């Protein structure tokens, strides 16, 4: 009887062992088809926008309730932009064209804690509309690169009637244009072909970078974003700093880091649309990039100049850099770009990922 009992114990133990082995094999199979993709880059480079696009393209998008939660963010973006403009007007001694707009600017200074279930507050509608039409405000906006004015103001203020409609539900494009500063780590999971992608976005401002270290283990692919339009823009956290110089410095440390010796390095020079638009009125040689010798308004040569500049900072001749010019708010362009990224990852890691 004792032996029989022991036999049952042994059988149960063997069964548990088989289950454990089965679970381990299942986990190994799952992990072999999982791509850990880390999004890095300086602040304002468009990382959060890329993450939203992945949700739109590959993960069923945003529900109506999720979209409504972005209304307070959009309102806060508009308010914050006008406050930055007001400070800049004082700094650059720019006057409002219409003196009556003084009271409208005062209204934009009033704090308002908006809930997700309420429409944008009406008392800010006329002030926003009138200020947007003021030539003094427009003059300050022209200097937006000098005081870190976010690039979504033109988009939102050209459509204020729609935003202040009582039944307004933010569109996908509204969500892509809206700006919510990333703190900590945000993860998005989506399936693409035979692979499952786990994409991590970490805060880009200097104070957030110390948190990146926790994401570095077993990264298959590093996606580094640069706002190519930031060549003439100051940093949010340092008005004397330059976004492009900050990105070059950060890229050099990342591209040559021991953490990424086995990772694929993908470089997105993002906001190429804004870059092309501003280049004729803001030549890159005016902003410290004096080793550029191409035509001042040739966006093809100027964008290649920056891509070459980033590639040259990679000190490992055997490590390939996969470079793309992107516009993170353009869903179709990003879909094509991510298709190229997918092909590269499959080709590069075929044995580890599929076999």
From Swiss-Prot:
Claim: Iron is one of the keywords in the record: no
Keywords: GTP-binding, Hydrolase, Magnesium, Metal-binding, Nucleotide-binding, Transducer
Region ranges (G2 motif): 174-182
Boundaries of every G-alpha domain copy: 33-355
Keyword Glycosyltransferase found: no
Amino acids binding Mg(2+): 48, 182
Gene Ontology BP terms: G protein-coupled receptor signaling pathway; negative regulation of pheromone response MAPK cascade; positive regulation of conjugation with cellular fusion
InterPro entries tied to this protein: Fungi_Gprotein_alpha (IPR002975), Gprotein_alpha_su (IPR001019), GproteinA_insert (IPR011025), P-loop_NTPase (IPR027417)
Region feature Disordered, mapped onto this chain: 1-20
Gene Ontology annotations for the cellular component aspect, listed alphabetically: cortical dynamic polarity patch; cytoplasm; heterotrimeric G-protein complex
Positions of the UniProt region annotated as G3 motif: 197-206
Sites where the protein binds GTP: 44-49, 151, 176, 182, 204, 270-271, 273, 328
SMART domains per record: G_alpha
Residue ranges, annotated region (G5 motif): 326-331
Coiled coil: none
Location of region: G4 motif: 266-273
Region (G1 motif) location: 36-49
Molecular function (Gene Ontology), one example: G-protein beta/gamma-subunit complex binding
Cofactor (UniProt): Mg(2+)
A Pfam family the protein falls into: G-alpha
Family of this protein: Belongs to the G-alpha family. G(q) subfamily.
Oligomer status and interactors: G proteins are composed of 3 units; alpha, beta and gamma. The alpha chain contains the guanine nucleotide binding site.
Protein task: Guanine nucleotide-binding proteins (G proteins) are involved as modulators or transducers in various transmembrane signaling systems.
Official protein name in the record: Guanine nucleotide-binding protein alpha-2 subunit
Organism: Neurospora crassa (strain ATCC 24698 / 74-OR23-1A / CBS 708.71 / DSM 1257 / FGSC 987)
